[in-house]
């Protein structure tokens, strides 16, 4: 069975309106599945059981609760909900029936991909009840433990392989790097940005192997829903993701790592998938290199020796690591004791007590899903151990080092005065002086193959993504520094007079500039030309290649002084704003999650027996509070963290920096 056939059966196992009427949810699930031409949804019950155990295994028997509130997954906050259950079910059912008409002639694969990506937004679009509409994305999967949505539950359910071989899954972690050094080795804002984007882009290239073999819902962290690169992937498959903004592709929102549930425990299959990921990344780098050299017409100039140096300098990038924790040991489910090498004895014993507690007092006996937090922690520890095994190939390079990284020898340079600055120590370096744009190499700069790839990667991106990356660049620091001056001065007649004289004397009808987004429509002159000290015969010759005389320079200065008198002088300083969210590792590991009581509906927590909660001081037996004081880490928690980061990066940061203020966003993700 293909992943998409599995997906459809598991996705429709629970209806999205389940919280409104739990006793009738199975009948509605079959009805909605039929709308979309899906049958056999009962086969998804084992995947559903594992996903449910991950999310809500610590409930006693016979606890029932109406849909009255929604809990925030990462805090103590809650929302009280008052909705008419019957009307809500009727409206959702009607919406699904109408929406399903556009899915009936699709292949199972396209149907699965579009249901995963578009169904939620299509329902929101068609729902008429405004109160119901706002709750659709966060309708809880269980009214008793309403801290995870039905959508997150269905995502996890569809990720779990529990058809032919019950619980046949592995938790998988993949990472590429180096991160800090690769991004920080920069001389321009564009270097910072492109270092971030390349790591994000290559991580997604690796993800494609999981997407194509297991489906997009198998990627647990980051959640690929509405991720720009995932939407672009769907576009390339001939599908239309709803409300997709191609401009968001420029935001590198995919981190340099991902966690996935892979539907196999076979070591050879896992190794094959991992090997294919590495091959995909290496092939993408090769394609990028070849396309860039071809576009810059460098490929025909390189000797065989230079090509060999280029290949050697790219061969160990990126560093790629992966680890997997199978959920089976031989033919049996993995047990808590099988993970004892990763934890202290106290931790193992505590989890054994918790498992026993859930087994004896819980609504259902726990299954392998109960151990997700242990699996994830063991996975991270395995990755830490793997990274300590540093693989390297000894390479000896004698010569002048790269201006950017200082690690590898210069292979490409621009030097207009003293070529021996590079050729004396690097006789095989390629002289690109006056042969490419100075945005890729400035005078006196020499780059290794990897840093040259980073500097010119936009050329490849323009070929891959089209106009999104056309003329991609960042404003100069002078443009940023004088932005508030330009905004204040642009409507003054003196501003127009200065611009007119500038173009008259230079005889240049138009200058290509990279302005701040907020000033883009009004910008005609680059910021540096609004600083009086930059108005010199030499500067015009060096920067624009034009000759102006001293009299014209004085006239321009007089015009500029008149403008200063009205608008003030432009500032010579700018700020770099660095905003970092601390403790991401602790959030992902569950260390900072709220107390266990905040997972439950507040009425349910009040109804739980004191001995179950651990509030009965007369009894020596441990309850929830003693055994698991904080919420258990689940895939839904990982999804919530990912969604918050994605929404912040895509919907808020750029708007705040570029639309509301005079700034330029370099990186957010």
Residue locations for each model-derived region?
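Regulatory/sensor and coupling segments of signal-transduction and defense proteins
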Residues: 1-669
